[in-house]
Regions:
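Residue-level detector of flexible, active-site-proximal loop/helix-junction positions
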Residues: 58-60, 93, 118
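ATP/NTP phosphate-donor binding region
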Residues: 1-85
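Glycine-rich nucleotide phosphate-binding loop and flanking beta-alpha elements
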Residues: 40-42, 93-95, 120, 158
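Glycine/serine-rich anion-binding loops at beta->alpha junctions
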Residues: 84-103
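Short glycine-/acidic-enriched loop or helix-start segments at secondary-structure transitions
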Residues: 43-46, 97-99, 123-124
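A glycine/threonine-rich phosphate-anchoring loop and its flanking beta-alpha core
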Residues: 100-171
């Protein structure tokens, strides 16, 4: 396992390697709510054995303010408060939506990421940019907010298509 801290308008701990088992040590005490997409939940059910994640639909077409609103409504329904930690488990779309929701829900709640794609590890999860699409324009609504940590567990890349691996290497 390799770990480093990244300082850009705040501090994020980035952990790289086979590290999902380290996650309990990284999570804060208190309530954690997980956000993922249906593909990740289906392909990696072992990641969600001890929780009831909020599942969004996969795909760029769901990276919208409507999805943000739906997630915020679900957080309200679950009684999430300012101390609730939001954990995004997925690729760049999930981490973008998670970071955006965490920044606007109750004017900001703490959050972190478990990136399940190589592209997500090298781009979306460590850039501090969290945006959603608006009226067909990519990332037109967004915020700059650093997660408390980013877990990049390389074993999670095993289910990725070669096209996704190439996209991550190119980034």
């Amino acid at each position: 396992m390799m770990s480093y801290s990244l300082q850009v308008a705040g501090r994020s701990r980035v952990v790289v390697g086979r590290t999902v088992e380290e996650l309990p040590r990284l999570l804060p005490q208190g309530r954690v709510i997980v956000l993922t997409d249906r593909n990740v939940a289906r392909c990696r059910p072992e990641l969600f054995e001890d929780c009831d994640p909020i599942c969004m639909e996969p795909g760029e077409e769901y990276k919208t303010l409507q999805t943000v609103e739906a997630v915020c409504r679900e957080l309200i329904r679950r009684g999430a408060d300012r101390t609730t930690f939001l954990l995004g488990v997925g690729g760049g779309i999930v981490t973008d939506v998670t970071g955006f929701v965490a920044s606007v829900y109750m004017r900001g709640v703490p959050f972190g990421f478990v990136s399940t794609t190589l592209l997500g590890c090298v781009d979306a999860s460590v850039g501090g940019k969290n945006g959603v699409n608006l009226d067909g324009y990519k990332n037109m609504a967004g915020v700059f907010a650093q997660p408390q940590f980013v877990v990049c567990d390389t074993s999670l890349f095993a289910t990725l298509p070669l096209r996704e691996i190439r996209a991550g290497l190119a980034e």
